[in-house]
């Protein structure tokens, strides 16, 4: 399911999945700016049926940081 997470992030950012891995950080992807961050979060919430608390959004710096919010979905 980690690959599904990467695929969702890639689709939200409009980049190839091969360009991303779990440790890929926002600063490493040009499209992952503040708007891209919101797009990524929205897509993850929709795809996995989860809700990421708004106060935690700023604590997400790389793809791996989404895993705790997915719980048993991954």
Regions found by a protein language model. Name each.
Residues 1-41, 46-74:
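Phosphopantetheine-dependent thiolation modules in NRPS/PKS and related acyl-activating systems
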């Amino acid at each position: 399911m980690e690959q599904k997470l990467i695929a969702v992030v890639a689709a939200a950012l409009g980049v190839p999945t091969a360009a991303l891995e779990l440790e890929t950080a926002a600063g490493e992807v040009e499209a992952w700016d503040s708007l891209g961050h919101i797009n990524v979060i929205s897509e993850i919430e929709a795809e996995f049926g989860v809700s990421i608390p708004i106060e935690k959004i700023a604590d997400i710096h790389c793809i791996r940081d989404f895993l705790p919010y997915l719980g048993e979905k991954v």
